[in-house]
Amino acid sequence: MNKLISWKPRASIHNLFIRAKIINNIRIFFINRGLLEVETPVMSHTTVPDIYLFPFQTNLYFLEKVPEKGVPMYLITSPEYHMKRLLAAGSGPIFQICHSFRNQEYGNYHNPEFTLLEWYRPYYNMVDIMDEVNIFLQTIIHCDSAEMLSYQQVFRLHVGIDPLLAELDELNQVLVKFNLSSTISLYNDRDKLLDFLFLMLVRPHLGNNKPVFIYNFPASQSLLAELNSDDHRVAERFEVYFHGIELANGSRELTDADLQRERFMQENNKQVAMNRPPRLIDEQLLAALECGLPSCSGVALGIDRLLMLTLKAKHISEVMAFSVTDA
């Protein structure tokens, strides 16, 4: 018997009891508000074209297919596409608690396999769904009511620029001003520079005392969201931060199948420009949109991170039985 092998869960049994209690409270919250709990596949024939997300791929072997190759399948990065197909089929308001997978870094706030809460509300606009997220957080983790700030406001406040107007030269000048120019090599990609400045200069200030909603992100950073009808430079998308941790993101969902296809193709063009293969477009999702996805808003929220805040945990492994290093 090898006594050196670590086999015990990293999280304490106490933390696992709290985890179970909070997940149960989440279910009660949504059931009491009239949402249907659904289950959708964690393995899909397609994946997201998003250049910032890296899916796990496997092969499914059917007898009628070429056996040595199999059929490519992907672990979901989110249940969004399947849930939108349910919405288009007339499900009404729905929620789901499921495992999702992203083949990316492991760290304090990241595990490749994580638990995601996702919900959708037909006929809710962005403000409606933000209000519900605010009530959800107050109910589940007993925090104060959130602060609401636009993406433009927080950049002006913490960076001193207007992110919707700033050109590449101005963004690079900000890097020099804050001694960040040696830490990033992508000086000619506006969106990546904005992301980097948000991460380094804005995010540390967010939600130190209460949650903060950042809304109206640039349209170029919003693959699945509707554009703001008054200002097409921004999309009706938001992110939620508390104590510097990104907890959730949501949006008023894009319902136009042709526009969604165009955005997917644009994202695949970026993949090719980065010497990556394009990703197969989800035709089933587009068919659902074409059939008629109702006007709706949705949210994805990381349950593990929510638990970290509740338990004042420093590492995500403290709130799950087994992280990737112990799996």
Curated annotation (Swiss-Prot):
Short name of one Pfam family: tRNA-synt_2
TM regions (residue ranges): none
Residues annotated to bind ATP: 102-104, 111, 246-247, 302
Taxonomic superkingdom: Bacteria
GO cellular component: cytosol
Gene Ontology annotations of biological process type: lysyl-tRNA aminoacylation
Keyword field: ATP-binding, Ligase, Nucleotide-binding
Coiled-coil intervals: none
Purpose: With EpmB is involved in the beta-lysylation step of the post-translational modification of translation elongation factor P (EF-P). Catalyzes the ATP-dependent activation of (R)-beta-lysine produced by EpmB, forming a lysyl-adenylate, from which the beta-lysyl moiety is then transferred to the epsilon-amino group of a conserved specific lysine residue in EF-P.
NCBIfam families per the UniProt record, alphabetical: genX (TIGR00462), PRK09350.1 (NF006828)
Similarity comment: Belongs to the class-II aminoacyl-tRNA synthetase family. EpmA subfamily.
Record's subunit section: Homodimer.
Annotated protein name in UniProt: Elongation factor P--(R)-beta-lysine ligase
